[in-house]
């Protein structure tokens, strides 16, 4: 068959409806969490949580600072004992002393009604209270204890997150819905009933909080499970039923690669549907691994979806038989680390630097092309190629590097480019 006999392909542009667009956010109210605005009118917020004993204010302050400097915009701490509650003022002061100003959220289970009343200064300093309606108390005490926490929130003008978890669901609500389901003509599966119970628990708690006088714009909701399909189901059912901001995350994502993949798979579909106003990636840290990894993964999920831009994107090839060594991989990692370490200073001095594109390529096949498309890029020599590395800036050849200091010289060129390209707005202002 000759190519001439093949049917012509349509070259008409796709209709607008078929073109990919940024997801339209589900409309929600705006909630102020210690100066960070959460809701559909604002960027999706990255949260994290410490794993230190909050009673150890020094260790907790160190970890909060690490998380905040990595880019966490809200940090949650466990408040589970009197010692932990008593340590919150010291924690906040330690953070202020080192110039870290990030909203601190108190995570309460079982005894939050007692701790918030006994430690009013802690209640005043926390930016938000997380309340789990599944473990605030049983029977009459459930409503009494919940009401106490809401009264404290009203007194100190604080928002609350009604945080329902699959593993600690209100058993009274679940039992009632299970009984109703058993009597139905076409009963649902236990999983579906459990998801219904999570939604009922969350919305009933939110309505009760409003009946107690808490403002509609003081409430956020989460309904967390530990698997992606159930997370999609519960949030897709919940989203049309309210306009409270929703916090997304798996309860337990797992460790390492498994946790990163599970969180990415779970969150991405909802975020692309416009569901979700804050996110947390709940990774189990590997031994010796920094806690801040959960922040970096959350940022990368949002950045990969085009929902936020946190730091310049480094494009690098995976490597193949054409590459002479792993040098380009080492350089790509060095540049990525250099950018992340530099971002706190760059973000303050150079507006727009987070949109910069950097390319670190390993051979002549795609290297020059990718480097030209980036703001600044380097194409390292592959097997059999001339041992020189051309550097492209804004699509044009800037210089050619060679010798043992290629990495250091490219880093210097990158820093100079940032100063010249993104420092103009500062100089003009």
Swiss-Prot record:
Record's superkingdom?
Bacteria
Sequence positions that bind [4Fe-4S] cluster = 317, 320, 363, 370
**InterPro entries documented for this protein:** Dihydropteroate_synth-like_sf, IspG_bac, IspG_bac-typ, NO2/SO3_Rdtase_4Fe4S_sf
User: Per the UniProt entry, what are the Gene Ontology biological process annotations, in alphabetical order?
Assistant: isopentenyl diphosphate biosynthetic process, methylerythritol 4-phosphate pathway; terpenoid biosynthetic process
Question: Mind listing the GO molecular function terms for this protein?
Answer: 4 iron, 4 sulfur cluster binding; 4-hydroxy-3-methylbut-2-en-1-yl diphosphate synthase activity (ferredoxin); 4-hydroxy-3-methylbut-2-enyl-diphosphate synthase activity (flavodoxin); iron ion binding
Keyword Oxidoreductase in record: yes
Q: Which cofactor does it need?
A: [4Fe-4S] cluster
Q: Quote the EC number.
A: 1.17.7.3
The pathway where this protein functions is:
Isoprenoid biosynthesis; isopentenyl diphosphate biosynthesis via DXP pathway; isopentenyl diphosphate from 1-deoxy-D-xylulose 5-phosphate: step 5/6
Q: Which UniProt keywords apply?
A: 4Fe-4S, Iron, Iron-sulfur, Isoprene biosynthesis, Metal-binding, Oxidoreductase
Cofactor binding comment, as recorded? Binds 1 [4Fe-4S] cluster.
Q: Which reaction does it catalyse?
A: (2E)-4-hydroxy-3-methylbut-2-enyl diphosphate + oxidized [flavodoxin] + H2O + 2 H(+) = 2-C-methyl-D-erythritol 2,4-cyclic diphosphate + reduced [flavodoxin]
Q: What does this protein do?
A: Converts 2C-methyl-D-erythritol 2,4-cyclodiphosphate (ME-2,4cPP) into 1-hydroxy-2-methyl-2-(E)-butenyl 4-diphosphate.
Q: Which family does it belong to?
A: Belongs to the IspG family.
Q: What's this protein's name?
A: 4-hydroxy-3-methylbut-2-en-1-yl diphosphate synthase (flavodoxin)
Q: Which organism is it from?
A: Deinococcus radiodurans (strain ATCC 13939 / DSM 20539 / JCM 16871 / CCUG 27074 / LMG 4051 / NBRC 15346 / NCIMB 9279 / VKM B-1422 / R1)
Which lineage is the organism of this entry classified under, starting from the top rank?
Bacteria, Thermotogati, Deinococcota, Deinococci, Deinococcales
